UniProtKB/Swiss-Prot annotation:
The keyword RNA-binding applies. Homohexamer. Signal peptide: none annotated. The lineage of its organism: Bacteria, Pseudomonadati, Pseudomonadota, Gammaproteobacteria, Aeromonadales. The keyword Metal-binding does not apply. Residues 9-68 form the Sm domain. One of its GO terms (cellular component) is cytosol. Keywords: RNA-binding, Stress response. GO terms for molecular function: RNA binding. This is RNA-binding protein Hfq.
Length: 87
């Protein structure tokens, strides 16, 4: 499970840290907008006029309002992931 979150956590953390507005699309088609206040393994707290707890299993897509640099890996980590993908 840690392998699956090696991309998700840095991405969500960059959105939270830089306070980038996001659109979150749910699996039922509803669009939520706001800023990511916090997140854990199961939920995202989305803040707009109120804070909403959104369960990750209900999320289809997270769309940032602008480009985000989320590659905060240790040196060599990206190369290791590419090597595994090619094998």
């Amino acid at each position: 499970m840690a392998k699956g979150q090696s991309l998700q956590d840095p991405f969500l953390n960059a959105l939270r840290r830089e306070r980038i507005p996001v659109s979150i699309y749910l699996v039922n088609g509803i669009k939520l907008q706001g800023q990511i206040e916090s997140f854990d393994q199961f939920v995202i707290l989305l803040k707009n006029t109120v804070s909403q707890m959104v369960y990750k299993h209900a999320i289809s897509t997270v769309v940032p309002a602008r480009a985000v640099n989320h590659h905060q890996h240790a040196p060599g980590a990206a190369g290791e992931e590419q090597g595994e993908a090619e094998a």
